[in-house]
Amino acid sequence: MTSLDVLINKATDPTLTSDNWQYILDVCDRISADPETETKRTITILKTKLTSKDANVVLRSLSLLISIAENCGSRVKQEIATKSFLQDALVKRLSDKKLHATVKYKICEVLTQLYNAFKGDPSLKPMTDAYNKARSEHPRYFSKQTQGPSKPAKKERTQQDKDREEDELQRALKLSLQEFEQQKTGKKEPDVNKPLPEIQPEPESPPVETVATVSKVRALYDLVSYEPDELSFRKGDVITVIESVYRDWWRGSLPSGKIGIFPLNYVTPIVNKSPQDIAKEIEIENKLITEEQRKIERLLAILSSQQIETINEDEVTHLYNEIIPLRIQLGNSIDKYGARQEELKVLNQSLNSEIKLYNELLDKSISSRAKHNTGGAMYQMSPYPTEQFPGQSQPQLSQQQQHQPYAQPQQTSNYAQQSQTVPPQFTQSQQTQPQYHQSHTRTGSHQEVPQYSGYNSNNIPPPATTFNQYPPSQLQQQDTSAGFGNDVYNRAAPGQPY
């Protein structure tokens, strides 16, 4: 690959979103340095670029063609004004149905510019012939009116605009209330003798088109935008209106699911069909499905018959003439339901994604709540630590806790002993008892009765206890060996077993 190929590839790179004039001038300088050898090579490369399927490459190549035609001398003009180059690279591209309309407008613009530059030289007559042929075969691409208008500026809605709309709304509501009050009050009897005034026809003001009154619009022109927030569409596309973003820009979505903003001068509102039009359309579709379908099936059956001598040519001609006009109706119905199918697919995808997101959030909420409840239940199951001694069952421990309301015996274990605070009244009468393999029960005189294995202490109720010797301030909260307050004193009435 020569240096010229590298320069042309850089100037026509498909990743370029606009013309890079530094690369274009580099190509012009390279051709001007050696026009004898580089001119024909450049036109050959450009011919390949102009027939590319990439619209971006074609647009960049057209800009490069204009630049070298105006800056690289007469030799380049002679190579451009050849019938093979003009027909294959420019004129024939206007008939390509797969080529975007924006590229066709650009080709016609280049042809016009080259024609104006070459028309003074009789030796460049093929350029004039190519221009006249393209203009006669494709006149719509030479008219600038068919191109979309310039996009309006994105002006933010000021606070004054919002206040003005609010004032107009309040004024309309006030007038509506006044008319309602006038109709509600008694009407005056009309004067019969008074002549009636002539009715003056009021000019009908066109309805104001707002987001509230317009739900769908149809594109009048093609719009190709490279801005990330703008919506690109083709002529005839139906856009669903979402909201008003700027003064002359709305946000909408295509049936394919693309969302973006678009200028209002590129679209026109779609008028909702009346009930009569909808009923007529349904009637035509039902007729196509019932009556016309049988005719189509009859014609197909006749044409697929193997017995050619039995075919009635008059019947075939009659059926064919009746079916041919139905192509437009069938095409419209196919387009209508095809667009509706695309809309439903997009809605289904959006709904599935929202349902998936909702289920994920719901699962996270349930799992976090379950963890929280499990932690709370574990905390409630063990409010204070208990220890089971060898040879002693758990019910005996519960009985021991039940029959020791004043203070629990000090428990020895491998861990550090817990400190306890004993009231002064207990220091003289209450002694620390050694821990055996049996539990103890205190009586009213603080005497210990041993409870051995198999002995049921529930058969003997505890005696009554007098609390007069303990001050109330010290009975409200006493620390036990387990480290928890024995607030059972507050709930037990004096003289009652607890």
Swiss-Prot record:
A GO biological-process term: filamentous growth
Domain SH3: 212-272
Membrane topology note: Peripheral membrane protein
Region (Disordered): 136-210, 374-498
Biased composition regions of type Basic and acidic residues, renumbered to the chain: 153-163, 181-192
Composition-biased stretches (Polar residues): 441-483
Skewed-composition ranges (Low complexity): 388-438
Superkingdom of origin: Eukaryota
Major localization class: membrane
Subcellular locations according to the entry: Endosome membrane
Family statement drawn from the similarity comment of this UniProt entry: Belongs to the STAM family.
Record's subunit section: Component of the ESCRT-0 complex composed of HSE1 and VPS27.
Protein name: Class E vacuolar protein-sorting machinery protein HSE1
Gene source species: Candida albicans (strain SC5314 / ATCC MYA-2876) (Yeast)
Gene name for this UniProt entry: HSE1
